[in-house]
Amino acid sequence: MKKILVAIFAISLVPNISLAGPKAEVLHWWTSGGEAKALSVLKADFADKGGEWTDMPVAGGGGDAAMQTLKARIVAGDAPAAAQVKGPAIQEYDDQGVIKPYNIDAVAKAEGWDKLVSKRVAQHMKCNNFTQYCAAP
């Protein structure tokens, strides 16, 4: 797949991820061979840091099916800990109050994301009038 996707994992969907042995159900549509291989790197890194990753792949539709699933889970009060979401949709979820609090902003500041991430990408990862990171690039 040669498309350039601005794909993120909105860790802030669920505000209470414990630092000691965090568990995260991750909704995504990276299901093809190459995508799944790339995702395995993220899973391994999370596991290496003591995390327990529960995979929730949703195939088909270039992410449309996954977004329908995510919306249904949010409405049911059962949002996953993290989800792959495309840029502008992040602000839409924020406008609905789904992402708050912006837990990932502290990580972004500590790691200096504003110096590492282009402004164009960062604008899709920030909420609260584009002042705080609410998603990871």
Where are the regions a protein language model picked out?
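Early extracytoplasmic/lumenal segment of secretory-pathway proteins
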Residues: 22-25, 31-90
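Positively charged n-region of N-terminal signal peptides that target proteins for export
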Residues: 1-4
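Bacterial N-terminal signal peptides
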Residues: 7-15
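Sec/Tat signal peptide C-region and signal peptidase I cleavage site
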Residues: 16-20
